[in-house]
A protein has these predicted regions:
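C-terminal interaction-tip segments
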Residues: 1-31, 35, 56, 95-113
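Generic detector of low-complexity/intrinsically disordered segments
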Residues: 5-7, 52, 71, 81, ...
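Short solvent-exposed strand-capping/beta-turn motif centered on an Asx-Ser/Thr pair
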Residues: 38-43, 97
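Acidic glycine-/aspartate-rich tracts in secreted/extracellular proteins
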Residues: 41-44, 55-57
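Short beta-strand elements bearing conserved aromatic residues within extracellular beta-rich modules
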Residues: 48-50
Length: 113
């Protein structure tokens, strides 16, 4: 069976207090993050972090995209200014300073290598 050339995915997650992988680029595909937004549904300002992790030769390198970005109550923040390319096995990680109030949504295009 032939592999799909392009696959669109939506990722949703309530941000935990410790970084968690919310998307890993599949083998044979490149992921293109088209949208990454976080909404604060709580009653006070909360902070969110989003990072890219690439492991090469067994060494994981974390690059922060946003770190401790404050989002006011009942507001939303775009976490990317443009697109982000994720190579095979790259991981997108998310965390916040609360485990209940930051809701993430992302749109990702996986394209066959």
């Amino acid at each position: 069976m032939a592999l799909a050339l392009n696959v669109f995915k939506t990722v949703t997650q309530i941000a935990p207090t410790s970084p968690v992988g919310i998307f890993t680029a599949s083998t044979g595909y490149t992921g293109v993050v088209l949208l990454a937004q976080a909404a604060n549904v709580g009653s006070s300002t909360k902070k969110v972090s989003l990072s890219h992790v690439r492991t090469t030769a067994g060494i994981a390198v974390t690059t922060e995209i946003v770190k401790d970005l404050p989002i006011e109550s009942s507001d939303t923040a775009n976490l990317l200014a443009g697109k982000l390319v994720l190579e095979t096995n790259d991981v997108l990680k998310l965390s916040a300073d609360t485990a209940t109030d930051i809701k993430f949504i992302g749109s990702i295009l996986e394209t066959l290598n």
